[in-house]
Amino acid sequence: MGAIETIEKYIRKIYHRNKVPPRVKAKAVLLYHWGIALRKVEKFIKALGLRGSREAIRQWYHRLSELIELVLESSQQLYVDETKIRGRRRLYYLWLAVDKEGKPCFAYLSRRRDTWTTKIVLSSSRGRKITTDKGWWYKRACRELGLEWRHETFGGRNAVERAFLLIKHRLKGFYKRFPWNAKFETISSFLRAFIFLYYTLEGLS
């Protein structure tokens, strides 16, 4: 099953009524995911003689965030990292963990980066062995949660860094329209949809 067919299958899980054919929605979602502007994706849909506004396309994409649990794995050994995401007049933090095979185990957007937030992130992961960078918030949180903590500069964390690079590259494509002008919930929804699609498509390759 190819990328379009796979995403079409998931579109059908979310939308039971479709004025726009699910396959067209799947193509539109993939174009947007790969960095094509909403304006151009809208023109693509209209060229097919169908109606699909920019806002509708954006909503199709964000609805896929509901399916992120389908790509998340469970593992005792986690490689965890976080990166800064600039939102409306402030910074947020995207946390991502993968297992030893590079498969995602959790993704979480927070307003803070401290021991308290790290404990929330790690306690929801169910992992027992945590490998991170030297961030003090990890070591302290692992100690308080009774988790085994290890520092590693490269290794398993490379898979997380690759995902972050792609996310940052995609966000740069918005120039200054998003996520700098967006609310926390909107940014979180977009990132969860992106991560779902990224790992779904990676699994097809």
Tell what function each PLM region has.
Residues 1-205:
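Residue-level recognition of single "structural anchor" positions
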